[in-house]
Amino acid sequence: MLTLQQVHYYYHQDLFAFDLEVEAGSIVALMGPSGAGKSTLLALLAGFIAPQSGQMALDGRLLNTLSPAQRPFSMLFQEHNLFAHLTVRDNIALGLHPGLKLTSQQQKQVEQAAKQVGIEAYLDRLPEQLSGGQRQRVALARCFVQPNPIWLLDEPFSALDPVLRDEMLSLVKQLAQERAITVLMVTHHLSDARAIASHFAYIDKGTIAAHGPIASLNEKHSHPELVEFFQAAV
């Protein structure tokens, strides 16, 4: 289980305070107004910023003192962050070794990851030779090839057209279920949350105002701001 206990972070005069428990293997949609703290939560978990107080832990192991590279997270953002001068094969391989010194077994892992996301035919191409959706598949393969139990996704498919976004969401759900990966995904789309999430966390004014099973995310919820958010999104 991933836990955040009284995790406090100050940005200028704004306080972000998070308490959350995430069961292993669940897919959690992080939702809420812009600027509420969704990306801040992911940045704290990833180690890009440090909390002033509180604890973050995975199965009892404290994460606060670990560097970003030591933490058990793979990350995927709206910007695919591919290296333009590297082939698809090498961009995926970076998920296994930053110096691209792969064993034969790791090379097979790269090819398998590419096949699972449907880009095995493009392994020797450069990113500029791919479509936007194909580039995001490369980024997803690099995320998937890493042996981490948790994925942090920050609106990774929001720039894609609706059909392609649905395809990528289905792919994330499929891959996560196959490997029992825990997923925390920031999204502004209620349809995305309903499509793949098992749970949701509604973030408002720097704190987790409501959370629970995705089925409870409806107009009958007891939290008024969440109901307003839900009605605006429908």
Swiss-Prot record:
It holds the Pfam family ABC_tran. PROSITE patterns: ABC_TRANSPORTER_1 (PS00211), ABC_TRANSPORTER_2 (PS50893), THIQ (PS51288). ATP binds at residues 32-39. Keywords: ATP-binding, Cell inner membrane, Cell membrane, Membrane, Nucleotide-binding, Translocase, Transport. GO terms for cellular component: plasma membrane. It is an enzyme of class 7 (translocase). It is found in: Cell inner membrane. GO terms for molecular function: ABC-type thiamine transporter activity; ATP binding; ATP hydrolysis activity. Its EC number is 7.6.2.15. It catalyses: thiamine(out) + ATP + H2O = thiamine(in) + ADP + phosphate + H(+). It is a peripheral membrane protein. Residues 2-230 form the ABC transporter domain. InterPro entries: AAA+_ATPase, ABC_SmlMolc_Importer, ABC_transporter-like_ATP-bd, ABC_transporter-like_CS, P-loop_NTPase, Thiamine_ABC_ThiQ. The complex is composed of two ATP-binding proteins (ThiQ), two transmembrane proteins (ThiP) and a solute-binding protein (ThiB). Belongs to the ABC transporter superfamily. Thiamine importer (TC 3.A.1.19.1) family. Part of the ABC transporter complex ThiBPQ involved in thiamine import. Responsible for energy coupling to the transport system. This is Thiamine import ATP-binding protein ThiQ. The lineage of its organism: Bacteria, Pseudomonadati, Pseudomonadota, Gammaproteobacteria, Vibrionales. The gene is thiQ.
